[in-house]
């Protein structure tokens, strides 16, 4: 058998359904203690049927939901600033001096991914997402594509978690 180890300790390897084109870096999200979780390109994911998804709602409802979360939005000139990580996922949504984390925003609006884009269109806020899941660790869609091309489980794990795969006795 095999185990994933980092600095002598077994790690609980995260996984998710479908990336936004690449996986997220553990270091960017959680700091040095997650340095073992690397960002890698997942080139086949953009071809997935559910890669792009769109959700829309009335602008008043959208901003009302943000305000209920403590994000103060100026009514006359609402401006949201999105901060992204290197894989394109939203880390933070800021309106003036208040903000909400990207994952919390994802939960609030019931989005499939925190890789999202906002666009106001005729009284509606349109939220377009890429991928499904948190984007950390093993991308199930890409791993499945690699397996269908003949990659072994060990090769797939080594791709997503380089240097962590250890053979057990």
Located regions from the model:
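Conserved, single-site charged/polar hotspot
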Residues: 1-169
């Amino acid at each position: 058998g095999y185990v994933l180890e980092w600095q002598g300790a077994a790690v609980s390897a995260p996984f998710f359904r479908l990336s936004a084109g690449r996986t997220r870096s553990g270091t960017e999200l959680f700091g040095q203690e997650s340095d073992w979780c690397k960002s890698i390109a997942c080139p086949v994911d953009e071809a997935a049927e559910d890669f792009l998804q769109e959700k829309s709602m009335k602008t008043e409802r959208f901003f009302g939901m943000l305000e209920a979360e403590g994000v103060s939005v100026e009514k006359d000139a609402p401006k949201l600033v999105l901060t992204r990580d290197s894989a394109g996922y939203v880390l933070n949504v800021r309106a003036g001096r208040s903000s909400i984390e990207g994952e919390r925003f994802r939960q609030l609006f019931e989005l499939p991914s925190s890789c999202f884009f906002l666009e106001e269109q005729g009284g509606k806020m349109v939220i377009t997402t890429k991928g499904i899941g948190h984007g950390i660790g093993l991308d199930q869609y890409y791993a499945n594509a690699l397996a269908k091309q003949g990659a072994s489980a060990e090769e797939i794990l080594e791709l997503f978690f380089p240097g962590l795969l250890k053979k057990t006795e």
